[in-house]
């Protein structure tokens, strides 16, 4: 049995979980999320504890077992505490500023780059070179942060670009001069 999948999920106080057939809905103080469980996997709720079970030991069932348990646990974490990714901008003249709920980046291009916040995502600009992406869906927060990072990936020679906070960029040595 999956080591992750067999662990029960404890539902904390203030979180409401509904299992309706193959749809699991989680509602908490920060919002509401739902997930459709893949067909061979079964989710049951008893006495404030969620258990994820699989009917057989086929390879597909085994892989979905741990995945489903982790996705539901991430939903519960999201509606209680939420998720946040911090990004840093490194480079001369590279900066970000908030324009309402959107962001405007100056990244060395001939034009400013605008990023609008999707539903459920909030941006916070701490300094012109630091920003954070937060929301209740771990997947959505990670995807939006990755899309922002993709606007100007860190350069391996000078280290300029957008990076996650604490990310170490592997630097390359430039060509040898005469």
From Swiss-Prot:
Keyword Transmembrane: no
Taxonomic superkingdom: Bacteria
Keyword set, alphabetical order: Ribonucleoprotein, Ribosomal protein, RNA-binding, rRNA-binding
Cellular component annotations (GO), alphabetically ordered: cytosolic large ribosomal subunit
A GO molecular-function annotation: rRNA binding
PROSITE patterns linked: RIBOSOMAL_L6_1
RNA-binding found in the keyword field: yes
GO biological process: cytoplasmic translation
Pfam families: Ribosomal_L6 (PF00347)
Family matches, as InterPro entries: Ribosomal_uL6-like, Ribosomal_uL6-like_a/b-dom_sf, Ribosomal_uL6_a/b-dom, Ribosomal_uL6_bac-type, Ribosomal_uL6_CS
HAMAP family for the chain: Ribosomal_uL6_B
Subunit (UniProt): Part of the 50S ribosomal subunit.
Functional note: This protein binds to the 23S rRNA, and is important in its secondary structure. It is located near the subunit interface in the base of the L7/L12 stalk, and near the tRNA binding site of the peptidyltransferase center.
Family the entry assigns: Belongs to the universal ribosomal protein uL6 family.
Name the record gives this protein: Large ribosomal subunit protein uL6
Organism for this UniProt entry: Arthrobacter sp. (strain FB24)
Gene: rplF
């Amino acid at each position: 049995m999956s080591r992750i999948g067999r662990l029960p999920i404890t539902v904390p106080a203030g979180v409401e979980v509904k299992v309706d057939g193959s749809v699991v809905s989680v509602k908490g103080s920060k919002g509401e999320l739902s997930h459709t469980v893949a067909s061979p996997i079964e989710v049951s709720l008893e006495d404030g504890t969620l258990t994820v079970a699989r009917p057989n030991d086929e390879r597909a069932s085994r892989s979905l077992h741990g995945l489903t348990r982790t996705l539901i646990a991430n939903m519960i974490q999201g509606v209680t505490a939420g998720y946040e990714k911090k990004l840093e901008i490194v480079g001369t003249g590279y900066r970000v500023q908030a324009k309402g709920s959107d962001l405007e980046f100056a990244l060395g291009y001939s034009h400013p780059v605008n990023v609008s916040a999707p539903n459920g995502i909030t941006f916070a600009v701490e300094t012109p070179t630091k920003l954070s992406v937060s929301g209740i869906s771990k997947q959505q927060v990670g995807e939006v942060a990755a899309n922002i990072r993709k606007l100007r990936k860190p350069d391996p020679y000078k280290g300029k670009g957008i990076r996650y906070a604490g990310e170490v960029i592997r630097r390359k040595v430039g060509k040898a001069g005469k």
